[in-house]
Every structure is written in C-alpha cells, then in structure tokens.
C-alpha cells in the first residue's frame, strides 16, 4: 500500500480515530500523521453516519470490492484476502440495552500492516475493551496484535454467554426433577439462542483457524499461535453448544411427557367423578319428572330419605372403585 497520510483519515463522525504508538498506547490521528507498520492507524466507523458512509464510498485507500463489504448487510463470519489487505467479518454477543444477546452484533474489518478500518452499526463491547487497554498503555502494538485482542475479547464474551445458557439448562433440569414445568416460550427461546449462536460461531472458528494458518505479513508467529489457541477455545465452546442443544431436546421431550401426564391425570379424575355421580344424576333426573306415583312424595321425610340414599349410593360407588383399584 502507498503512504497513508493522516489527512486522508479525517472523518468528522468517526466513532474512533487513533494511531497506535507501537508501545501499547494510542494518539489521535493528526492531519500530519503518517501510518507505518510499526504505528498503524485505526479508523472505527458507524457506517450509518453520513460522513462515514461518504468516506467509505469515496476514499482511495480502500479497494472497490471492500466498500460495500464494510457497509453491507450482515453476513456470516468470513475472511477474504485482497492483495496486501484482508477483509474480515466477525460476529459478537450483543450486550446493548433492549436487545437479546443472541441478536449478534457484526464487526467488519479491512486491514493492512499500516491501516485498520473497522465498521459497525450496533456497539461492539469487545472493541471498547481493546480501546480501554490502548488508552491505559497496555493495548496492542501493531495490526496483527490488534486483531488478536479483538477476537480474544469476542471469544471471551461468547464463552461467557455459552456458560450462562448452560446454567439455564441446569436450572431447567433441576426444575423438571421437581415436576416444575417452565414458563411458556422459555424453552423455545433457549433453543433459538443455542441454534443461532451455533450457526455463526462455527464459521467464525473457521475464520480464526484460517487466520492462524495464513502467512499474513502483518501477523507474527506469536499472533498466529494465539489465534490458534482462540480458535481451539471457541471450538470447545461449540462442543458445549452441541451438547446443550441435545440436552434441550431431551428437556423438551420430558416437558411434553410431564404435560401429557398432567392432562391424563386431570382426565382420569374427571372420569372418576363422572362415574361416581352418574347413578345419582340418573336418580335425581328420574325423581324429578314431576309425575304422579313417585315414591315418597307424600312422606314428610321423603326428601331426607332420598338424600341419604344418594349419599349411600355415592359411598358404594366409591368403595367399588377403590376395591377395583381405580382410585
């Protein structure tokens, strides 16, 4: 890449605009700054901001095929080499307010040894973590180190979210052991979160593996080794996701079984009640026809006698059901 001057990186509505000092810190990109491999410039943009969108479409620092990629629709994680630059798309857990974590945020990055251009729409907390390290003087020192720190933060947040989902599954299993059925939709939401995370984290692991194996000029051997370790860590998280998805399938079957048992018990109870009161209903209907000749209609104790007869009949039917082991 030709010389990258700070004057070409002045974007008024940029989220962040910094130059790494090569010692773990950052300085603002001044118009007189010159990006080097030892001190690359980092431009972090929200592609929905007007000046940022215009810069992405008009700057000569970006290849033509990269422009739409940095401001396009969300896609699955991938990495593409473009000459001396690399286009990377990654996904992360969404910790923004009023959003579910499984509604993943997207970060798109175009990198060379001298320039880092990253874009997003929704806030990515892993980037803020890296910026905090840079502002405290303990951050990455070059482009490759910057990328490793970003993917390390994304993977840490993903692992934490997977652990939270695992804890929810354990709680559901404990509740089912106590015959407690979860709230409607809770299991469906949990399975959706697991499946969505599995869908995007599997290709993201492949991206990390490729970055670790590619001989990118701006990544040294230590960066490649760390990238491979991060890929393996995410792979273990994917194994946990697979086992969690299988466990939720078992939980769904168990919940269906519990609900069916509860329905069967209610139906059985109603059937027994019908059997108990069917003879009494027949007799009360028979004696209620209001025709002449009904036994006891002239007896002052006729009603009491009839009620006692009904009680005896109910007790008799109940005894028979008990003796037949239906109760």
UniProtKB/Swiss-Prot annotation:
Zinc transporter. Acts as a Zn(2+):proton symporter, which likely mediates zinc ion uptake. Residues 1-271, 322-327 are cytoplasmic. Keywords: Cell inner membrane, Cell membrane, Ion transport, Membrane, Transmembrane, Transmembrane helix, Transport, Zinc. Pfam families: CorA. It comes from the Bacteria. The gene is zntB. The chain crosses the membrane at residues 272-292, 301-321. GO terms for cellular component: plasma membrane. InterPro entries: CorA_cytoplasmic_dom (IPR045861), CorA_TM1_TM2 (IPR045863), MgTranspt_CorA/ZnTranspt_ZntB (IPR002523), Zn_transp_ZntB (IPR023714). NCBIfam families: PRK09546.1. The keyword Membrane applies. It is found in: Cell inner membrane. GO terms for molecular function: cobalt ion binding; cobalt ion transmembrane transporter activity; magnesium ion binding; magnesium ion transmembrane transporter activity; zinc ion transmembrane transporter activity. This is Zinc transport protein ZntB. It catalyses: Zn(2+)(out) + H(+)(out) = Zn(2+)(in) + H(+)(in).
């Amino acid at each position: 890449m030709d010389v990258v001057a700070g004057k070409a990186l002045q974007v008024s509505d940029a989220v962040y605009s910094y130059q790494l000092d090569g010692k773990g810190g950052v300085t603002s990109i001044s118009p007189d700054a010159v990006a080097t491999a030892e001190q690359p410039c980092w431009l972090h943009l929200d592609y929905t901001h007007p000046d940022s969108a215009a810069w992405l479409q008009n700057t000569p620092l970006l290849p033509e095929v990269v422009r739409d990629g940095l401001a396009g629709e969300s896609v699955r994680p991938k990495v593409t080499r473009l000459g001396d630059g690399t286009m990377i798309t990654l996904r992360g857990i969404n910790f923004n307010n009023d959003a579910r974590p499984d509604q993943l945020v997207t970060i798109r990055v175009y990198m060379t040894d001298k320039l880092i251009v990253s874009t997003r729409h929704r806030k990515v907390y892993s980037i803020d973590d890296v910026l905090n390290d840079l502002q405290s003087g303990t951050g990455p020192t070059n482009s490759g180190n910057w990328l490793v720190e970003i993917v390390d933060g994304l993977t840490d947040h993903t692992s934490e979210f997977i652990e939270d989902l695992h804890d929810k599954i354990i709680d559901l299993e404990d509740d089912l052991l106590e015959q407690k059925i979860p709230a409607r939709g809770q299991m469906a939401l949990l399975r959706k979160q697991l499946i969505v995370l599995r869908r995007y984290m599997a290709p993201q692991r492949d991206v990390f593996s490729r970055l670790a194996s590619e001989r990118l000029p701006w990544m040294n051997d230590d960066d490649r080794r760390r990238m491979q370790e991060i890929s393996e860590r995410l792979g273990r998280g994917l194994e946990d996701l697979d086992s969690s998805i299988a466990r939720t399938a078992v939980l769904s079957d168990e919940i269906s079984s519990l609900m069916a048992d509860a329905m069967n018990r209610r139906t059985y109870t109603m059937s027994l009640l019908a059997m108990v009161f069917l003879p009494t209903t027949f007799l009360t209907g028979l004696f209620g026809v209001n025709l002449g000749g009904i036994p006891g209609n002239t007896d002052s104790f006729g009603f009491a006698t009839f009620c006692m007869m009904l009680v005896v009949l109910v007790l008799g039917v109940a005894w028979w059901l008990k003796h037949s082991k239906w109760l």
